[in-house]
């Protein structure tokens, strides 16, 4: 059982290799929302 778990964990990086570009972009999403808030406030005139 333990060796099966270790084998599964060893295969995970290969399984998620296709999502590598997505994982590079994910940390930028909060920055995008912060900038969106500034653009929104600028459009309504910083009420």
From Swiss-Prot:
Pfam assignment, any one: PsbK
Annotated signal peptide: none
Superkingdom field: Bacteria
GO biological process: photosynthesis
GO CC, alphabetical: photosystem II reaction center; plasma membrane-derived thylakoid membrane
Biological role stated in the UniProt entry: One of the components of the core complex of photosystem II (PSII). PSII is a light-driven water:plastoquinone oxidoreductase that uses light energy to abstract electrons from H(2)O, generating O(2) and a proton gradient subsequently used for ATP formation. It consists of a core antenna complex that captures photons, and an electron transfer chain that converts photonic excitation into a charge separation.
Subunit structure and binding partners: PSII is composed of 1 copy each of membrane proteins PsbA, PsbB, PsbC, PsbD, PsbE, PsbF, PsbH, PsbI, PsbJ, PsbK, PsbL, PsbM, PsbT, PsbX, PsbY, PsbZ, Psb30/Ycf12, peripheral proteins PsbO, CyanoQ (PsbQ), PsbU, PsbV and a large number of cofactors. It forms dimeric complexes.
Family: Belongs to the PsbK family.
Protein name as catalogued: Photosystem II reaction center protein K
Species lineage: Bacteria, Bacillati, Cyanobacteriota, Cyanophyceae, Synechococcales
